[in-house]
């Protein structure tokens, strides 16, 4: 399995390289998460990451292969009465592209905790993640 500490540190490093990101937060379902999200100021552009899920397959015990579903979000908190959702999508598109380039670039170093299991990556617009947020999700499979 992917070590959560290494996974968190990877996203923190990615966030440090992209100045328009104001924070990096793990998405958990608890009261603290709700407080953190509602406490973010308007205009905050956050890299949210989900702890990865794991699926394993194999014909034999010695040929067991792990794949981890990884999902991150680049979301901006905005005031829907002052800004259109499409404007937020436009302004965050370059940021999600930079996150994608960091993921792909990290594969060259050989020590990334998220080695790509395949080159299938999905990026989708997100407008209902939380009220007052819009942006993009990025999903991919990583090797264990």
Question: Each PLM stretch: what is its role?
Answer:
Residues 1, 5, 86, 90, ...:
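Charge-dense, low-complexity intrinsically disordered segments
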Residues 1-63:
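Small/polar-rich, solvent-exposed N-terminal microdomains that initiate assembly or binding
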Residues 11-22, 45, 90-143:
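Acidic-leaning, charged glycine-interspersed low-complexity segments
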Residues 48-50, 68, 75-79, 116-120:
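Alpha-helical context
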Residues 63-67, 75-101:
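Extracellular/virion structural assembly segments
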Residues 64-79, 132-144:
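Oligomerization/assembly interface segments of phage tail-like spikes and tubes
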